[in-house]
A protein has these predicted regions:
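Transmembrane-helix motifs of polytopic, lipid-linked glycan transferases
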Residues: 65-72, 164, 169-197, 224, ...
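Hydrophobic alpha-helical membrane-interfacial segments at the cytosolic entry of transmembrane helices
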Residues: 86-93, 266-288
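Specific aromatic-rich, kink-prone transmembrane helix
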Residues: 183-188, 211, 222-238, 354
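Aromatic-enriched
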Residues: 304, 381-448, 453-457
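Start-transfer (signal-anchor) and selected internal transmembrane alpha helices
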Residues: 2-96, 191, 342-347, 430-437, ...
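Transmembrane-helix signature of polytopic, membrane-embedded enzymes
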Residues: 80-81, 85, 186-208, 237, ...
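Intramembrane catalytic core of multi-pass membrane enzymes that act on lipidic substrates
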Residues: 79-174
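Aromatic/glycine/proline-enriched transmembrane-helix motif characteristic
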Residues: 174, 183, 279-283, 299-366, ...
Length: 457
C-alpha cells in the first residue's frame, strides 16, 4: 500500500501537466484553422480596394488569434506536437497567401522595374520610371510603379536580387522563402539562447509578416534574414561572420545600421574592415551614378511622410520637418548610447532600436514593423505585440484634405493604430515610477522577465 500511494501521486501529477498541454496543443490547431480561413478569404479577393474595411477587420481578427497563440506559448510548456503545428501552420499560411492577385502594396512592381532597368544595362540609381524613352520597361499590368519620379531607394544587394527575378510571382516566392528562412534562423537563435523553440510562433504566425512577404512580396525579408544570421553569429561568438552578415543586411535595407555600435562593442577592428570592404564591393557596380548614387534616398528622406506617429509631435514642437527629424535623430542616438553603456543584450537592443525608429520616423509603412517582430520571440512585450497587430491599420487609404494637398492618413486611424500602444507603454512607465524601479529598460516593460510578466497581465 505504501508503494502505491507515491505511484498514484506521480501519475496524477503527470496528468495535471499533460492535460493543459494537450488542450493547448488542440487549441493551437484551432487557432491555425481560424487564421487560415481568414487568409483564404483575403487571397480570393480580386480587388482589395473595394473591400478595405473587411480586409483590415479580418486582419485584426487574425491578430487576436495570433496574440492568443503567443500567450499560450508563453504560458504553457508544450511538446513536439505543438511545435509541429506551429511550423506546419506557418508554411500553410504562406502557401495560402502566395496566389493572391490583389495586394495592399505595389512595391513589388518597382522591384520588377528596377530589375528590368539593370537587365537593359541601365543604372537604377540614375534613371526612374518617368524618365523619357523608358516606357518600354513598364509592366502593362501596372504601368505606374511607386516613386515614378525618383531613382531607386534600395541598396545594392536588393538591386542585384531584383535583377535576377523577372515576374511578380517570382518576387513573392523568393521573399517568402527568405521569410521562412527567418523562421529557421530564429529557431537556431532560440536554441542558442536556451529558450523554448515554440516561441518562434511570435514571428511565424504574425499577420503583418504574412501580408508583407507572402502576399505582397516585400523584400525586407532579405534584410531581416541576413540581420538574424548576423545576430546568430554574434551571440555564438563568431565575430567575422557576424560583421559579414551585418554588411549584407545593410546592403539590403539601411535599418541594421542602428545596431552597428552594438556589434562594434563585440568585435575587433579587423572585422569592421570586413564590413566596410563588403559594402564598397557591392556598390562598385553602381558607382558610375557618381553624385546621383543617393538621389533616391535623399528624395525619400525629404518628401515621404506616411503613417508616422511621434514624428508629427516632434515636427510641431520644432516648427519644421527638418527640426523634427533632428530631434528624432538625437533621441535615437541617445538610445543607442544608453543601450551600449548598459551593455544591453543584442537581441534586446534590436527590439528597442528597430521599434524606436518606427515610432520616431515620418514614414512607418505596415511592412516596416516586420523589422522588429522577430525579437518578440525573445522579449514578448505586450505593447509591441499590440503594435505588430494594429500596424495593419496603416493599410487604410490615405486621402487628400484639399486640392493639391498631400495624401494623409486620418487622425482617427492613426489614433486607433498607435493610441493603445502609447497608453500601454505609458502605464508601465507609470507603474515603474510608482514602485521606484531603478531607471532602465524595465520602465517600458522590455526586460526578459518583465515582458513575460507584462504579457501575462
Amino acid at each position: 500500500m505504501g508503494e502505491i500511494v507515491p505511484i498514484l501521486h506521480g501519475y496524477i501529477q503527470r496528468l495535471k501537466t499533460r492535460w493543459p498541454r494537450d488542450i493547448v496543443t488542440l487549441g493551437l490547431a484551432a487557432l491555425a484553422a481560424g487564421i487560415t480561413a481568414v487568409f483564404r478569404w483575403v487571397a480570393r479577393q480580386q480587388d482589395l480596394d473595394a473591400c478595405t474595411p473587411e480586409f483590415i477587420g479580418l486582419l485584426l481578427l487574425a491578430g487576436i488569434l495570433y496574440v492568443i497563440g503567443v500567450f499560450w506559448v508563453e504560458r504553457y510548456r508544450l511538446g513536439t506536437a505543438a511545435l509541429l503545428i506551429i511550423l506546419v501552420s506557418a508554411v500553410l499560411f504562406r502557401v495560402t497567401l502566395l496566389p493572391a492577385h490583389s495586394t495592399p502594396s505595389d512595391d513589388v512592381y518597382r522591384y520588377q522595374w528596377d530589375g528590368r532597368v539593370q537587365r537593359a544595362h541601365l543604372n537604377p540609381y540614375v534613371v526612374f520610371p518617368n524618365s523619357p524613352g523608358l516606357e518600354w520597361l513598364q509592366n502593362p499590368d501596372h504601368p505606374e510603379p511607386p516613386a515614378e519620379e525618383s531613382p531607386t531607394i534600395y541598396p545594392p544587394l536588393s538591386e542585384l536580387a531584383y535583377r535576377l527575378i523577372e515576374t511578380v510571382p517570382g518576387y513573392k516566392r523568393v521573399s517568402t522563402i527568405l521569410d521562412l528562412g527567418c523562421v529557421v534562423v530564429l529557431m537556431f537563435l532560440l536554441g542558442a539562447m536556451k529558450q523554448p523553440l515554440h516561441r518562434v510562433l511570435a514571428y511565424a504566425w504574425n499577420p503583418t509578416v504574412l501580408i508583407a512577404f507572402a502576399m505582397s512580396g516585400h523584400f525586407d525579408s532579405l534584410a531581416i534574414f541576413t540581420f538574424l544570421v548576423a545576430l546568430f553569429f554574434l551571440v555564438t561568438n563568431r565575430p567575422a561572420l557576424s560583421m559579414g552578415a551585418l554588411a549584407l543586411s545593410f546592403l539590403s535595407k539601411f535599418f541594421p545600421v542602428l545596431l552597428l555600435v552594438t556589434f562594434l562593442k563585440r568585435v575587433r577592428l579587423a572585422h569592421v574592415g570586413l564590413f566596410a570592404a563588403l559594402i564598397f564591393a557591392f556598390y562598385i557596380a553602381y558607382l558610375d551614378a557618381g553624385l546621383h548614387l543617393l538621389d533616391g534616398a535623399r528624395n525619400y528622406a525629404r518628401d515621404w511622410v506616411n503613417n508616422g506617429s511621434l514624428f508629427h509631435l516632434l515636427r510641431h514642437v520644432a516648427g519644421s520637418r527638418v527640426g523634427g527629424e533632428l530631434i528624432a535623430a538625437l533621441v535615437l542616438l541617445a538610445a543607442i548610447g544608453y543601450l551600449a553603456k548598459k551593455q544591453a543584450p543584442p537581441l534586446l537592443a534590436s527590439l528597442v532600436l528597430t521599434g524606436g525608429v518606427l515610432l520616431l520616423s515620418p514614414t512607418a509603412y505596415p511592412w516596416y514593423f516586420t523589422w522588429s517582430i522577430p525579437f518578440l520571440c525573445f522579449y514578448p512585450s505586450g505593447a509591441w505585440l499590440l503594435m505588430s497587430v494594429t500596424s495593419v491599420l496603416g493599410y487604410t487609404p490615405a486621402i487628400s484634405y484639399g486640392a493639391g494637398e498631400p495624401l494623409k492618413h486620418s487622425l482617427l486611424m492613426l489614433s486607433l493604430e498607435y493610441g493603445p500602444v502609447y497608453v500601454w507603454l505609458a502605464y508601465h512607465w507609470w507603474v515603474a515610477r510608482r514602485t521606484e524601479l531603478s531607471p532602465g529598460l524595465e520602465e517600458v516593460g522590455l526586460s526578459a522577465a518583465g515582458t513575460q510578466r507584462q504579457f501575462a497581465e
